[in-house]
């Protein structure tokens, strides 16, 4: 297969790197980790070559990773509810939490893009709540 090269926003790149770092911490299967580590190395290399980091960007990345870590836990908890066919108050709370955290995640990614002058920006628009 040919290599696919696409331009992405800095926020999207850091989001993906943060998720891969979480996977490296959570996933234990050596075969899966081999692919995760490879993808992480490729993306991290592109970040280091193409993005000038500073304290603000480091802080935004840390916050983005914290949000993604919370989302990981929530999604695991939702799967347990699914497994137990429990779609009551806890499932509803978890599902709502995903919306709120994803809104925060989008704001952080946009802030990263604005801070770094990224040409590409992920723009979101949802019904207000």
Name each model-derived stretch.
Residues 1-129:
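Extended, charge-rich alpha-helical interface modules
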């Amino acid at each position: 297969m040919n290599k696919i090269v696409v331009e992405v926003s800095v926020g999207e790149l850091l989001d993906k790197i943060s998720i891969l770092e979480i996977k490296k911490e959570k996933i234990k299967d050596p075969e899966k980790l081999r692919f995760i580590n490879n993808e992480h190395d490729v993306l991290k290399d592109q970040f280091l070559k193409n993005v000038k980091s500073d304290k603000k960007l480091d802080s935004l990345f840390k916050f983005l990773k914290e949000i993604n870590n919370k989302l990981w836990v929530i999604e695991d908890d939702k799967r347990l509810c699914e497994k137990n066919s429990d779609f009551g108050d806890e499932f509803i709370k978890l599902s709502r939490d995903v919306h709120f955290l994803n809104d925060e995640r989008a704001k952080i990614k946009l802030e990263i893009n604005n801070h770094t002058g990224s040409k590409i920006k992920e723009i979101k628009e949802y019904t207000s709540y």
